[in-house]
Amino acid sequence: MAWLEGQSVFLTGGVAGLGRALVKRLVEEGANVTVLDRNARGLDELVESFKGRVAGSPGDVRNLADNRKAVELAVERFGKLDTFNRQRRHLGLLCPPCRPAGRCHQRSFDEVIGINLMGYVMGIKAAAPALVRSRGSVILTLSSSAFYAGGGGVLYTVAKHAAVGLIKQAAHELAPYVRVNGVAPGGIASDLRGPKSLGMGEQSITSVPLADLVKDIAPIGRLSDTEEYTGSYVYLASARNSAPATGVIINCDGGMGVRSVLGPASGGKGLLEKFGG
């Protein structure tokens, strides 16, 4: 039996990248999905691709009314809401350091914090009543910048660290009716863009040789595919399999937290030759 059979999921940012992969996985696991995304054309294509299983609601994740409209659509179309998944992430890797002499200003603060933090808050606020009724769950997408420095600019790293606190506080405030958890993926080769306020709206993370960089620094020795991250979301969305989990963040960083600071990134090189296989 599929893990999410008959469930209704509200997901933001599902048109491309990890969000698109997650929509596919959720449908495969038996869920119906309502997607909020600013890309109206991409949203129409997504809905057409999953006939009858996906509903689209164009809008801005920072706007409470847009989030409420998507929640209403999910309940109207699929009868209930079981999980809110805040998926869209603003690009941090290309953001310049926010030093006193750098390009950090109020507009970039509002943009990066707004998308990466207020979007979480607005989504939770809109979805909470329906989730309380269904005894559902919230799953927020973080990144390795929620735990480590150096993976993004100051604003992005601050936003992701703040989201850790948001998960813990929301888990407390919504208990015992709603579980609140997070998934922190490592590097992803998707078309995430930089802040428009810094003139980086057309810069994509695809311009960075991410696969080569991660290969050398991550203990697992490679860049993970978007599909490989989706299982963590399915696990947390399944009350049958993760009922005791709330205030939890699954850190899928490819082992960055255990890499050596003096030796090679991974300590198991040579084991294949030693043990065979």
UniProtKB/Swiss-Prot annotation:
Q: Which UniProt keywords apply?
A: Aromatic hydrocarbons catabolism, NAD, NADP, Oxidoreductase
Temperature effect, per record, is:
Optimum temperature is 40 degrees Celsius.
EC numbers: 1.3.1.49
GO BP annotation list: phenanthrene catabolic process
Q: Where does substrate bind?
A: 143
Which molecular-function annotations from GO does this UniProt entry contain? Answer: cis-3,4-dihydrophenanthrene-3,4-diol dehydrogenase activity
Q: How is its activity regulated?
A: Inhibited by heavy metal such as Hg(2+) and by p-chloromercuribenzoate.
Q: Which Pfam families match?
A: adh_short
Task: Name the reaction it catalyses.
Answer: (3S,4R)-3,4-dihydrophenanthrene-3,4-diol + NAD(+) = phenanthrene-3,4-diol + NADH + H(+)
Please list the residues that bind NAD(+).
Answer: 10-37, 60, 160
Respond yes or no to whether keyword NADP is given for this record: yes
> Origin, by domain of life?
Bacteria
What's the record's pH-dependence note? Optimum pH is 9.
InterPro entries for this protein: NAD(P)-bd_dom_sf (IPR036291), Sc_DH/Rdtase_CS (IPR020904), SDR_fam (IPR002347)
Q: Where, by residue number, is the active site?
A: 156
Briefly state the protein's biological role. Involved in the degradation of phenanthrene. Catalyzes the oxidation of cis-phenanthrene dihydrodiol (PDD) to yield phenanthrenediol. It can use either NAD or NADP as electron acceptor, however NAD is preferred to NADP.
What family is this?
Belongs to the short-chain dehydrogenases/reductases (SDR) family.
Listed under subunit, the entry gives: Homotetramer.
**Protein name as catalogued:** Cis-3,4-dihydrophenanthrene-3,4-diol dehydrogenase
Origin organism of this chain? Alcaligenes faecalis
Q: Which gene encodes it?
A: phnB
